[in-house]
Amino acid sequence: MVNPRTKYTFIKSSILIFLIPLFFACSEAKKKEEPRTEPYKIIGYVAGYEDFNPALVDATKLTHINYAFANIVEGGVAFELKTDSVKISKLMGLKTVSPALKVLYSVGGWVWSDQFSHVAAFDWSRKKFAISCVQLMKKHGFDGVDLDWEYPGQRAEDNAFRPSDEENFTRLLAEIRIALDTQGKVDDTHYLLTIATGADQAYINHTDLGQAQKHLDFINVMCYDFYHGWHFQTGHHANLHPSDKEKFNGNSGLEAISRHLKAGVPANKLVMGIPFYGRQWEKVIADNESLYQPARSTGVIVPYWDIVEKLKSGNYKKMYDESAKSSYLWNAKDSIFISWETPKEIQLKTDFIKEKGMGGAMFWEYSLDKDQELLNKLYDSMN
């Protein structure tokens, strides 16, 4: 005969054993269902040197615009093109349509990064540069500053570089952050400081992103140009995953983001860069339908709208690398290979961004997608 007290205790214990995992399951479900409090960023670069009217930008589909580029002149920053002021004014006018829009200006880029190492090298030069950044920002009414230093500690387009760039880059960002916050207290606002970063391991090795990110609002990772204008062989220039067909030690968006996370950057500060252009190689060897094959030319930039026009000729065969999650085109008649981004890749990348808890997406560059096919897909996918 079972003791009633023992029987009651057994039943109570059984109920608890049943309810405890149910409680945690419900708690986990609740956690997963918690809505994202901060909207995803959609950041578009607008190049001042392109023949494009910034007033045509659809600001309703963007959270941020980065106007490119300001140059480094005599230790400070300055716009060099005669058309810059007019174009900047038109961008600022977009805030009447989208009051929450943030407009930043970007310093440097591939051509104008030659002086970064010098201005970052000394305490006095960092202070001078930071003050100049704030002055130019205030002059035109920008909401912040974006640095596109290509690249700290490495050779690029005739740029100066030195071993101390790694530490000096972080010091420069800290100085700019101080200057922006000082001005922000006066204006009762928060001014943004962001950077564009390289996607390869070499960039990680020559910077200290774990420390640098402490001074930054977010980081735009340039997840493109994995095969570019120096390569005399074809390849995916913006693939999300590594390709099982890879021959030349290429890169991928997944690997680029993983490197940044490992370097100490929080996922919500990482913004994935997406190209609104392709890379084209000519006189390509036809083996394997031209993927990862030698070419007589390097990978030149082709705007997305131009690729769409090329397809109308009927000479291009659409190809897809399932392992890399990347599209490419092969023109057997003219031996032309094009690596390009399509709405399919946009969807896959926005899914990846959400899965990883990242901050959003960035793209280069607005004028390269005239009919906004890629932008519309990006906006719909992120929302």
What is the meaning of each model-derived region?
Residues 1-9:
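N-terminal secretory signal peptides that target proteins for export/translocation
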Residues 24-25:
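C-terminal motif of bacterial Sec signal peptides marking the signal peptidase cleavage site
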Residues 32-137, 154, 164, 173, ...:
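Glycan-recognition patch characteristic of GH18 chitinases/ENGases
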Residues 46-61, 123-138, 201-211, 257, ...:
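Short, acidic/polar
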Residues 65, 105, 147, 176, ...:
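Conserved, mostly hydrophobic/aromatic
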Residues 74-86, 152-309:
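Substrate-binding surface in catalytic domains of secreted glycosidases
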Residues 91, 107, 227-230, 236-238, ...:
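Glycan-binding loop/region signatures in secreted carbohydrate-active enzymes
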Residues 367-383:
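Aromatic-rich peripheral "rim/lid" segments of glycoside hydrolase catalytic domains that contact
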